[in-house]
Swiss-Prot record:
Organism: Paraburkholderia xenovorans (strain LB400)
Name by which UniProt lists this protein: Putative iron-sulfur cluster insertion protein ErpA 2
Subunit composition and interactions: Homodimer.
Any one annotated GO CC term: cytosol
Top-level division of the source organism's lineage: Bacteria
Amino acid sequence: MQTLAQPAAATSGALPALLEFTRQAAAKVASLIEEEGNPNLKLRLYVSGGGCSGFQYGFAFDDQVADDDMQTVTDGVTLLVDSMSLQYLPGARVDYEDGLEGSRFVIHNPNAQSTCGCGSSFSV
């Protein structure tokens, strides 16, 4: 298991994180965990085959941490990513955005060569 703690602000000379979990996303996850009533929950991000572009992102709550999970902690909230999914996500940013189309979690993935209009599928 690999654990990365995300600082509130990056310090100069710091190594880039494998995956950024923004404060906005962490705050939304914290409120959802509170609604669930289980403080042991963590948000799991995974990549699976499918979608119109070949791969798709998925989110689920999980209270278990596997040996091959990477954990990223922002403001006390944990994001889990398994090692298979992580290979498609280095340098990606998990964010939560409020826009005209509504509110949603968004993954900004520099490894995606193309994405679907819905934003949940991509190709590499």
